[in-house]
Amino acid sequence: MERDGEQAGQGPRHGPAGNGRELESPAAASLLAPMDLGEEPLEKAERARTAKDPNTYKVLSLVLSVCVLTTILGCIFGLKPSCAKEVKSCKGRCFERTFSNCRCDAACVSLGNCCLDFQETCVEPTHIWTCNKFRCGEKRLSRFVCSCADDCKAHNDCCINYSSVCQEKKSWVEEACETIDAPQCPAEFESPPTLLFSLDGFRAEYLHTWGGLLPVISKLKNCGTYTKNMRPVYPTKTFPNHYSIVTGLYPESHGIIDNKMYDPKMNASFSLKSKEKFNPLWYKGQPIWVTANHQEVRSGTYFWPGSDVEIDGILPDIYKVYNGSVPFEERILAVLEWLQLPSYERPHFYTLYLEEPDSSGHSHGPVSSEVIKALQKVDHIVGMLMDGLKDLGLDKCLNLILISDHGMEQGSCKKYVYLNKYLGDVNNVKVVYGPAARLRPTEVPETYYSFNYEALAKNLSCRETNQHFRPYLKHFLPKRLHFAKNDRIEPLTFYLDPQWQLALNPSERKYCGSGFHGSDNLFSNMQALFIGYGPAFKHGAEVDSFENIEVYNLMCDLLGLIPAPNNESHGSLNHLLKKPIYTPSHPKEESFLSQCPIKSVSSDLGCTCDPSIVPIMDFEKQFNLTTDAVEDVYSMTVPNGRPRNLQKQHRVCLLHQQQFLTGYSLDLLMPLWTSYTFLSNDQFSTDDFSNCLYQDLRIPLSPMHKCSYYKSTSKLSYGFLTPPRLNRVSRQIYSEALLTSNIVPMYQSFQVIWQYLHDTVLRRYAQERNGVNVVSGPVFDFDYDGRYDSSEILKQNTRVIRSQENLIPTHFFIVLTSCKQLSESPLKCTALESSAFLLPHRPDNIESCTHGKQESAWVEELLALHRARVTDVELITGLSFYQDRQESVSELLRLKTHLPIFSQED
């Protein structure tokens, strides 16, 4: 750096620096020569006589004036040449103490004499990470965060957009979309790296609405693989979702069930601002950087929940302890620097995390100018990344996953529920407030498990008309939420309507009128962002929505890793990739089918059937079907293949009827499933089939098969899996559906839901979808883990009713399958669509607050709340569907894991 006051092509300063003295000019020296003190005495005397002449004084005065003027001009033009040449700009003069009519050093601010461009030229480059035309060709200064000097390439300190701004090359966003048929990587990269980049709180709708203001993200969307909605996990909070993305696990499985939580066994509380956040005991499962470490693949994380914690004793190879004050640009540059490390140090997997637009959404709400500014900011940051990758030759090499953890909702102080309004004294309870609130006693851990949560739930149920919250014992929550099997989830939880939140009292919550998240993961405003871009992803593809737990396996495939056990369906995202890496296969059936020949003796069931119903006169003739008849039954009842049983050592036999097929459990003495097809022109009769059963001689007779067994029980009865009221060919179908092999124990309160489902919903589906195939059956999930129960758990939960052991289902499932093409029959679809439900089987309908409501309203609401993935049904029943289909297994997994979102109007 040159000295102060000097510029290229200028002479040195005149006079000793700092003493205020300056050397005489040659002109002044010659004029002062007659006054030299070294003259002889006679000459002095002569001069003295001459000086008495008045004209002499005038001449001397004139000479002295000229000398002074010459000296001043010499100072101006000889000593300060820089002032005349450049006095208006700081370019090339930043922080140098040059003295002119404007200055460019730090003191100019207090003196008030800065050049007009001081801020833009000298100050902004200390914290701005981009070039502009004015900065091009600037002088390099160490205090600038990046350089726009002409030699910045040689010094490797250029701002990321230097090439596009100063060399007039196209930026990444200015280039046209290009199909990347194969990775185009620098020689030092053996395979494409993967970068997982999170924009916290980026609601999916933001891109739908403001995409025109987000050129970089919009280009990634248009050139890569994109889904309009990626489904977060519940609760839709930051830590649970980020950790689910990198583990493939639901919060109940990986342990991070909220941003704030209490563990009764550890007797410790977790929050984002506490030291407990760094305690590895909170983190279960295996995040992808640990998976990578186990398989000798390096990783680098610039922030990610859990990445600064020693999980399983392992940290990423390069990581940063979270610090929200680090500028976004610095994070981008760091990752770009990591990508330039030697191969033996360079990570193969990377994460990046930005707090926006979540922070602005919380402060100002999702529909605000501040959020739009935040979106434009993160779009600019993503653009920096893409330009940086382009400069490194990695823009056609690296696989980028641009993702968010959840959406954002507008809060309102008028849409907050306070429990003290209903409970009065609330000193003995504590509530984790928000849209997914939870309650526990204050005395913990002593009373955590013994507290009477059930009584409190009943007390808070149906207190008001159109109540906006529902108290749930956690095992009654919709199974699709997967939010029960963890002690950190309090036994009493609250489900809130869209836009609503709950707290103990007003003083407990922080704010109410700004943005929030945490609600049901099917609400449209909770949906998240997903874009995949790079050589592995399809070009310009838009895919159906999927859940973020599926991303872990996808990343493992991109990195060549074997995934750790997780909750995902490996291969369900194969349709995002040009060349899928993993090929899934159907699970093998674990229990072979047993025989159920006709061997029972007819007995009196204590039933009274309507005389109009045609009874079964010759059981063997009617149900001992020929091979051709069996094939006809298969094609009509299970056109997509019969469900396979994945439960080990479970005796099941197939029972063929003319109009439906049954998988009957000889261990449970009830059907595991029945399957039939409801065609668009089928009708339901209005006949009464109560108190009418026919004995199925192919199965052992049980007291629970008799009408007399249920006559003295006020709440428990039986229900039919295949509805007897379905009218197709003749009255003979009635007697088939009235067989004892078609009934299950069912609460009378639930029969209302079950009948509406068959009489109304199935009929509507059949008419709208040109027919529908139906598979339904009981569910047993007493340990509420979303998996089918073992025989030991079933035995522990068997109830004795009227001296008879009875196993009452916890839920009932129903899977509806139709054709994607409405012109096709469900008996022969080229492509499928499916819907599924897991309905809680309870002795009352308190969940729905039925008083004063139309049956159609509350049942439809209940069905919507308890919809599920087909995969959820498979996990909880031990069944596997669609195994006879011709589609690839990955395509079937795509179908099974799909779940439509709720619009805000639903």
UniProtKB/Swiss-Prot annotation:
Cofactor: Zn(2+)
Cytoplasmic topological segments: 1-58
EC number of the protein: 3.1.4.1, 3.6.1.9
Free-text cofactor note: Binds 2 Zn(2+) ions per subunit.
Binding residue positions for GMP: T238, N259, L272, K277, Y322, D358, H406, H517
Record field: transmembrane: 59-79
Extracellular-facing ranges: 80-906
PTM characteristics: The secreted form is produced through cleavage at Lys-85 by intracellular processing.
UniProt region (Disordered), positions on chain: 1-25
Active site: T238 (amp-threonine intermediate)
Modified residue annotations for Phosphothreonine: T238
Residues annotated as binding Zn(2+) 1: D200, T238, D405, H406
InterPro entries named among the record's database cross-references: Alkaline_phosphatase_core_sf, DNA/RNA_non-sp_Endonuclease_sf, Endo_G_ENPP1-like_dom, ENPP1-3/EXOG-like_nuc-like, His-Me_finger_sf, Phosphodiest/P_Trfase, SMB_chordata, Somatomedin_B-like_dom_sf
Entry-linked Pfam families: Endonuclease_NS, Phosphodiest, Somatomedin_B
Domain comment (free text): The di-leucine motif is required for basolateral targeting in polarized epithelial cells, and for targeting to matrix vesicles derived from mineralizing cells.
Subunit structure: Ectonucleotide pyrophosphatase/phosphodiesterase family member 1: Homodimer. Ectonucleotide pyrophosphatase/phosphodiesterase family member 1: Interacts with INSR; leading to inhibit INSR autophosphorylation and subsequent activation of INSR kinase activity. Ectonucleotide pyrophosphatase/phosphodiesterase family member 1, secreted form: Monomeric.
Protein name: Ectonucleotide pyrophosphatase/phosphodiesterase family member 1
Originating organism: Rattus norvegicus
Gene behind this protein: Enpp1
